[in-house]
Amino acid sequence: MGNSYGLWPLVVINSLIFIIFAFSFTKPKTSWDWRSFGAFSAFLVALFTEMYGFPLTIYLFSGWLSAKFPGIDLFSHNSGHLFEDLFGWGGDPHFGPFHILSYIFVGYGFILLSNAWKVLYAARRDNTLATSGPYAKIRHPQYVGFILIMFGFLLQWPTILTLAMFPLLVWMYVRLARSEEENAQKEFGGEWDAYVKQTPAFIPKLKPKIAN
């Protein structure tokens, strides 16, 4: 595999950088916070393990990939950007369409986490319901932020493990969101019910058309 893999210090460094970065935005406190953050951290470790440590996905599909792309060095680092290979991007994969899209999703996901945390922290401090900022558009921007980041990394470097983990983590976040909503309803009652009627859970509403 040459010098492209077996770079375990990079696995550790990159995992820590993104985990600490996410931690600085989310600052988990409740058990729900820690569960969502722990699952997200596991996804990042699995991702960077294949990106820099051992390319399990490429190894398992090496026969098929070699037949389909006979001129590609499968175990070079650039070949790990599988979507760029599969869709015939001939240039540097770091500037390919999927990689650029991944930057957008990952970047926006972290911005959403940061903005959501500021509102949520203030609401918890004052024992009020978070309804401003990102919470004015959707009820669970923190989970949407995690999902956007994971989806962005999947576009950049898809692996068997992360592709399998992604739907499970989305399902877990939906369950955590429902548990949080049950507690919020008990705590805030009618205020929460009114908020739910006006604000979707995960996907923001399109702006209504202005009548003539």
Predicted stretch roles:
Residues 1-131, 149-183, 187-212:
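Membrane-anchoring alpha-helices and their flanking helix-loop junctions
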Residues 137-144:
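Histidine-centered phosphotransfer motif of kinases
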Residues 134:
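Short alpha-helical H-box segment flanking the phosphoacceptor histidine in two-component systems
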